[in-house]
Regions:
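N-terminal export leaders
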Residues: 1-2
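Low-complexity, Ser/Thr/Pro/Gly-enriched N-terminal "stalk/linker" regions
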Residues: 5-63
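Short amphipathic alpha-helical segments that mediate assembly, nucleic-acid/protein binding
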Residues: 9, 13, 17, 30-33, ...
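Residues that form generic nucleotide/phosphate-binding pockets
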Residues: 19, 23, 35-40, 146, ...
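Intrinsically disordered, low-complexity segments enriched in polar/charged residues with Gly/Pro
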Residues: 33, 97, 320-323
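Aromatic-lined, polymer-binding surfaces characteristic
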Residues: 37-277
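Extended polysaccharide-engagement surfaces of secreted carbohydrate-active enzymes
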Residues: 230-371
Length: 371
């Protein structure tokens, strides 16, 4: 992006943070806040039911501390909430953030400390900027400094992981008005939107992650969530997604990603290890990505509106489908779409990798695939 003058830069940071707040706006029910407060330790700012020493790789227990402070922050800053402007709740947020900084919980799964935790902290701090009282500058600064030190660097990762780390770089850059970090983060969001023979968007319009694994769903979900999210934040600014990147993204989403979803359910062949998760084929929540794209890629807005109607259940699974047969020569995957049915074939191939297992997920189907 072109350099901005001081006034323009200030306005852009405020605009980006306003869009981020709108994206995550929530009004936590008072009952949930009251339940969380029952286990709040007034002495040190911890929660008595959270195991801060746990390092388990999935459903990491200490993250509950951040999730509760996150809800407290939105309750404190949301007009109409019974805790809006509540000074006692504000004091608990401050003490809770101080406790988290001093305790510095660590997870054996890097994802929690480099993606989940810093993303939530960034959003929370952006929201708290709207409060009647501001958290101490020293507390905000040291929290953000640790996020920068321990939260990873997007350039060291690929695909969805790169985008997810870049997101909290964006949050931190807005809070600190650091144009260099903001530019780096945006580059790392947009740079993966290229055709490659490595991990990422393939020349046949499929998507690979973790080597040569077909991951149209799973990691495909994540990278689309992150890219469309950032593209909406930067829409109408000098940081907007480049047109050629938007075209590649839209082609993948319209012709591959949403083509593997029948009605609201995704074909299981493209889900990776996530196939073992309950109700994972239900992709109705991905209507959000299509809604974003209808605004970003207005030339194909009607196509996205049809996708949204199918995912929301307002139209049947056949609505606006055009018969199409596609063989993905990089993925060794075939997709056949008709108004009345859809089927796919994922081939046994030496050019691709079979579905993985990891983080306690998918050991059974991985073993069966080996048989």
């Amino acid at each position: 992006p072109a350099p901005a003058n001081s006034s323009q830069g200030d306005n852009e940071y405020q605009l980006l943070m306003k869009k981020i707040r709108q994206d995550f706006a929530v009004n936590p029910p008072a009952k949930e806040i009251e339940e969380a407060l029952k286990t709040y330790n007034e002495t040190d700012g911890s929660f008595t039911d959270v195991d801060y020493a746990s390092i388990q790789r999935t459903n990491w227990p200490p993250l509950l501390h951040i999730d509760r402070l996150y809800d407290f922050a939105f309750a404190y800053t949301t007009p109409g909430n019974s805790y809006y402007g509540n000074e006692a709740l504000f004091d608990k947020i401050v003490k809770g953030l101080e406790f988290w900084y001093e305790r510095n919980p660590w997870c054996h799964n890097w994802w929690y400390n480099q993606i989940a935790e810093p993303q939530r902290l960034g959003i929370m701090l952006i929201q708290l900027r709207t409060g009647k009282k501001q958290i101490p500058a020293e507390l905000e600064t040291k929290t953000l400094d640790r996020v920068r030190k321990d939260g990873g660097h997007p350039a060291k990762w690929t695909g969805a992981n790169r985008t997810d780390i870049a997101l909290h770089w964006i949050y931190r850059a807005c809070l600190t008005q650091n144009e260099e970090d903001l530019a780096l983060a945006l580059d790392n969001v947009y740079n993966p939107i290229v055709y490659t023979t490595k991990e990422g968007f393939q020349h046949d319009n499929s998507y690979f992650q973790h080597g040569r694994q077909l991951y149209i769903g799973g990691y495909g979900d994540e990278i689309l969530k992150g890219i469309t999210q950032v593209a909406m934040y930067t829409r109408g600014t000098r940081f907007a997604i480049p047109e050629e990147k938007l075209a590649l993204l839209s082609k993948f989403m319209r012709e591959t990603y949403y083509a593997t979803i029948r009605g609201r359910h995704m074909l299981f062949d493209v889900l990776g290890r996530g196939v073992s998760r309950p109700k994972i084929t239900d992709k109705s929540h991905t209507a959000l990505f299509a809604r974003r794209m209808a605004q970003l890629d207005t030339a194909h807005a009607a196509e996205y509106e049809a996708i949204i109607a199918r995912l929301d259940g307002k139209e049947n699974a056949a609505h606006a489908l055009v018969p199409k047969h596609t063989h993905y020569y990089r993925a060794d995957y075939t997709l056949h779409v008709r108004p009345h049915y859809t089927f796919d074939v994922r081939m046994v191939s030496t050019r691709t990798a079979r579905c993985e297992y990891g983080n306690g997920e998918n050991p059974v189907s991985y073993t069966h695939l080996r048989a």
